[in-house]
Amino acid sequence: MLSVVIATQDSERALLPTLAALVAGAAAGLVREVIVADASSRDATVAIADEAGCCVLDLTLPRGPRLKAAAGTARASWLLFLRPGVVLESNWVEETRRFIEEVELRKDPQVKAAVFRAGPLGSATIEALALLRAALGAWPDASQGLVIAKSLYDALGGHRDVQATERDLLRRVGRKRLVRLRTGTIGIT
């Protein structure tokens, strides 16, 4: 149902907590595979990803083309893009599955995408800042991840070779197709 794509480069310390948070999704049958698109790391990033059972692609490409190439190998019909160090809250599996099922049941020609809420639920300061950013028209941050139908991702042309590749993709998805999930993310550095 879901292929997770993570672009890494010397990310050994940040990758482990991100992968640990995905175990519940794999156990529940939501996560089909995790693809790590690595840019020739010199630390233990590749060893950690390999030991965790991830598909590791060694791609000496800029971030955008690396993400696009990794997404091109994905076998699931939905993609979840995460940055190393982003840890999803424990309720992410149920909410993500519900979001995907609702979109697929509606067979809406305007297939939607979703981002996770910035910060853990109950963190008043982070929630207030995220609401203020949204009210002022700011786009979600790359640390919020992105759940997107592979068909929509492909139709949009995927990630491009631009400076803020995640933000560029979100803008092409558009506000009307973008849903903000209640599940939060926690950034680990």
Q: Model features per residue range: what roles?
A:
Residues N91-A124:
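Conserved donor NDP-sugar-binding/catalytic core segment of glycosyltransferases
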Residues L59-A74:
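Glycine-rich, basic loop-to-helix element that forms the pyrophosphate-binding segment
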Residues L79:
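Short aromatic/hydrophobic "clamp" motif used to bind/position activated sugar donors
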Residues D10-A26:
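Short, well-formed alpha-helical segments that are part of the catalytic scaffolds
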Residues D38-V46:
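A conserved acidic beta->alpha catalytic loop
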Residues P109-L121, A130-A155, I186:
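A recurrent flexible, glycine/aromatic-enriched loop bordering the glycosyltransferase active site
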Residues M1-S3, E33:
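Cell-envelope/extracellular polymer assembly enzymes that use nucleotide-activated donors
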Residues A44, G64, L82-F99:
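Acidic donor-binding/catalytic loop of UDP-sugar-dependent glycosyltransferases
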